[in-house]
A protein has these predicted regions:
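Generic beta-strand/beta-sheet core signal
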Residues: 16-18, 36, 98-101, 107, ...
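A conserved beta-strand->alpha-helix junction
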Residues: 50-57, 121-126, 130, 134-180, ...
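CN hydrolase (nitrilase-like) catalytic-core segments centered on the catalytic cysteine
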Residues: 1-50
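Active-site adenylate/phosphate-handling loop in enzymes that bind or generate adenylated species
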Residues: 1, 117, 147, 170-225
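ATP-dependent adenylation/pyrophosphate-handling site
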Residues: 94-100, 104-141
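Conserved helix-loop functional segments at active or binding sites
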Residues: 85-94, 115, 119-122, 162-165, ...
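Phosphate/ATP-binding catalytic cores across multiple sugar-kinase/actin-like superfamilies
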Residues: 75-97, 190-196
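Catalytic P-loop NTP-binding/switch module of NTPases
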Residues: 36, 42-43, 51-81
Length: 225
């Protein structure tokens, strides 16, 4: 409640906080959705642990919305760098490893890790599959060059094809061949990254984002390593 009010006052913009009601694995969501106006005053508060539907009218034209300032963005960056550096130090890790796909998420984690522990202590592993684009590999190589860290290429295509053949997943099946094949790729990458972590004493950094974590959009035993 206080956080929502603070954000509304800071940005001079109404904030609508919508929260799930119910249990999801080991997490219980309590609902209690709320709306704060541009002054930070709570103008609607839902009951906790009950489903709730309501309509609220807001003037979103005035005052003009204000985005996150550069100072706030810099504070977030500093917090993430400190978090990586401190976690590694307190758990006796001096080196890290991560999977680099060429996308924004893994690229951002790589940049933060290079700053936190030093580029010389970071290994970025590219693990192309039959579905990897040439652009993603090129982008990954360019990032590694800019950061000055070590890069490795560990293709998963051969292992992926063998597993599909062994489990007969390459042939049409009833409901779910594409999902199984997609998740197998992530899990194979997880095996490679954990092997490097164990063999070289490197901390494995996850490259998922908070949106994926919030809705559970990830592969168990793959992205969750």
């Amino acid at each position: 409640c206080d956080m929502v009010s603070h954000r509304a006052r800071l940005t001079k913009t109404p904030v609508i906080f919508v929260n799930l009601v119910g249990g999801n694995d080991g997490i219980i969501f309590d609902g209690a959705s709320l709306v704060a106006d541009e002054e930070g005053d709570i103008i609607l508060q839902a009951a906790a642990f009950e489903e709730f539907v309501e309509t609220v009218e807001l003037d979103v034209r005035k005052p003009d919305a204000r985005g996150i300032t550069g100072g706030e963005t810099e504070s977030i960056r500093q917090a993430l760098v400190l978090g990586i550096r401190d976690y590694a130090r307190k758990n006796s890790f001096t080196k890290c490893v991560l999977g680099l796909s060429g996308g924004i998420d893994s690229s951002l984690v790589a940049a933060l890790a290079a700053e936190a522990i030093g580029a010389e202590n970071l290994v970025c592993v590219m693990m192309p599959s039959p579905f990897s684009s040439e652009g993603s590999i090129k982008d990954s190589e360019e990032l590694v060059k800019n950061l000055g860290c070590e890069s490795r290429i560990e293709p998963i295509s051969a292992t992926f094809e063998v597993l599909l053949e062994q489990m007969n997943l390459h042939k049409p099946t009833k409901g779910g061949e594409s999902l199984a094949a997609e998740n197998i790729q992530s899990r194979l990458r997880g095996v490679i990254l954990m092997a490097i972590s164990n063999a070289e004493g490197r901390l494995l950094l996850s490259t998922g984002n908070k949106s994926e974590l919030a809705v559970g959009y990830c592969t168990l035993y793959g992205d969750t390593n």
